Amino acid sequence: MKEIKSLMVINLLCVAAMMAFLAVVGPIIRALHMQEWHAGLTVALAGVVWVVMARYWGRKSDKVGRKPILLMGVLGVGVSYLLLASYIDFALLIMPPVVLSLGMIVLARALIGVFYAAIPTVSNALIADKVVASERTNYMAKLGASSGFGMILGPAVGGYLAVYGLSTPLYAFAILPLMAAFLVYKTIPKAPKKHVEEVPHPKWSDVRLRLPMIAAFLTMYSVVTSQVCLGFFVIDKLALDPTLSAKVTGYILSLVGVCFILAQIIVSKRQGVFPQKWLLLGSTIATIGYGIVFMMTSGVMLGFGFCIAAFGMGLIFPAFQAFAANSVSEAEQGAAAGTVSSAQGLGIIIGPLASTALYGLNPIFPFVVASIAFALLGVFTLRHKACMTSSC
């Protein structure tokens, strides 16, 4: 598939732009005299919009083609990002009422989420269109690795650029989706429309997508749990002051990102391995990793546990995407990709709410639940494999 390199760059640029906001959202909220829950609202909103829009974009791309929807998505992210940067630049100068800032930031983030939902959905559907079933996991892993690089690059560069002004990273990263739009226009071929009377739309309850949806939800839920709870866990369990804990948290999250990418690179290099095998292996490794986390006795052990868990989740990500693509017909690829993508969005919504509630009961509970969840995913995968063998 000759378009894979372009898709990798497109996803890297757009993910980096999305994640750069996380590096400055806290300082922006404080500078505009807003409250911490306002930051949580703007981040959680992205998950809500993802759930709502991913299936829509997937179905739309089945009907009108992948390129127009992908181009609309990346352009929309770029323009919406410019709107966000412009408002924050304006707000930092005149300090408008908090309710106005909240409304404008929520609106801009919602628009970004609306258009971003199209990018992973259509990218995965495009791979499913172009790549035979036996090689889809490898290509999904390449795409996932590029997104992982974006997850690391965005906050790192965004934090560095913030010394030149809180709106500077937003202006800089708004350019990246516009560059991605140029790549879409120049390198992604426009496929002819398929003459079909009606494109089938897999439902949320579609039994064919049940396992990949469970895997997508649990994995994204656990990723968000790690991001939200790690800083608190470092302070409470290692008894560090806030400044040092922030540094330790940053180091651990950087290592987690590297392990996440490494796992997907390994998947991309292995040919002919069925997605179910990666799901089973990844869920087993993630179970062990989170088990180490909640039983940890030192900072080194904590970092090691998170790295093991991240490696396991890195194996799972491309597996559930390829599993979904292999489970449906050619005409259903976009809708299936959107359905599974919306399950990821649901994990983003529920993750922060459930994990912080569990943390309030006991700091180890979020990680105990994550470990049990991945153990259950392994059981579900084995059961699915047994059902396929016995036609149950």
Question: Predicted regions: what is each one?
Answer:
Residues 1-47, 211, 220-239:
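Helix-loop boundary and gating motifs at the non-cytosolic
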Residues 12, 94-118, 301-315:
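Hydrophobic core of transmembrane alpha-helices in multi-pass small-molecule transporters
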Residues 25, 118-131, 315-328:
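Intracellular juxtamembrane helix-capping segments at the cytosolic ends
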Residues 48-52, 248-271:
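Transmembrane alpha-helices of Major Facilitator/SLC transporters
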Residues 53-66, 262-275, 359:
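Helix-to-loop junctions at the C-terminal end of transmembrane segments
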Residues 75-98, 285-297:
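C-terminal ends and interior cores of transmembrane alpha-helices
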Residues 108-147:
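Cytoplasmic helix-loop-helix junction between adjacent transmembrane helices
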Residues 275-320:
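C-terminal transmembrane helical hairpin of 12-TM major facilitator-type secondary transporters
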